[in-house]
């Protein structure tokens, strides 16, 4: 189990700050650190919105488990009652989480991987950072939305 610290506040400014620091890493050719920051940004955002619901984030250490918890708490499941384009985007979010987790686990500075390391390029690192920032912003927006009158 992994100890997940309580996040005091995650807001758009925080998301921009982490993303900016990751871009600086990219500009300094430190792609591994940028990928690690991408995952950290998602983990912290997921934990924050879980805690907003008064729940305790899972301590499994798997980012996919945190995202599953977020989806359950905020009813973010694909549905036949939702426009197919929205469902496609929600499915894409799953792939972002999975890809960032895999890349960080297999190619970043988080673990020694020896000769199996895949050296990514700057444009790939930017894709990871920008995808994580976009997803973090979306998750925050979902958590902060006002309930509609119908609910």
Model features per residue range: what roles?
Residues 16-24, 80-85, 113:
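Short, charged/polar, low-complexity loop and linker segments
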Residues 54-93:
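Short, charged amphipathic alpha-helical segments flanked by flexible coils
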Residues 22-29, 52, 111-115, 143:
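Secondary-structure edge/capping motif, primarily at the C-terminal ends of alpha-helices
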